[in-house]
């Protein structure tokens, strides 16, 4: 589908044309069906774009009020916050996680670096000891992460994980 065939609406402030260009490329080159993006800078909305369709049949247009599930949003926010802390010198990308969380070093995890966690190469991809529902019981889930052995040598393999 050509980009001019895809309904794209909204606002893109001065100096943010590159955001609109990439947004359009998602449809034209990357097979996006429907999406939206909103960016605030200094408390001001500078980008508010939406386009495409809600359904694969491309029958229902995506609008500014389309609601979607945001999977794994915490990962990007965690990475953003961690990079801010790195930039401020509060965390070292190449330091062991155990420098900041000593109990994490249990079960062969002493060599896992901050970079391994952020790049999904730490090897801690699940928690054998995590009982059902422990996501909602902070001390229990943290203890399960601390007790978990890595599935591989940190930094040697990568896999999506849902514990960070």
Label each region the model flagged:
Residues 67, 126-164:
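Catalytic-site signature segments of enzymes, centered on catalytic residues
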Residues 64, 69-73, 85-129, 147-149:
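Active-site helix/loop module of the DD-peptidase/beta-lactamase fold
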Residues 14, 18, 112, 116, ...:
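Generic alpha-helical secondary structure signal
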Residues 15, 19, 70-74, 78, ...:
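Hydrophobic (often cysteine-bearing) scaffold residues that line and stabilize catalytic clefts
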Residues 12-15, 66, 93, 110, ...:
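Residue-level signature of the cytosolic catalytic core of signaling kinases
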Residues 34-36, 96, 157:
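Residues at or immediately flanking beta-strands
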Residues 4, 9-70, 90-92, 143, ...:
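Short, conserved catalytic-motif segment at the N-terminal edge
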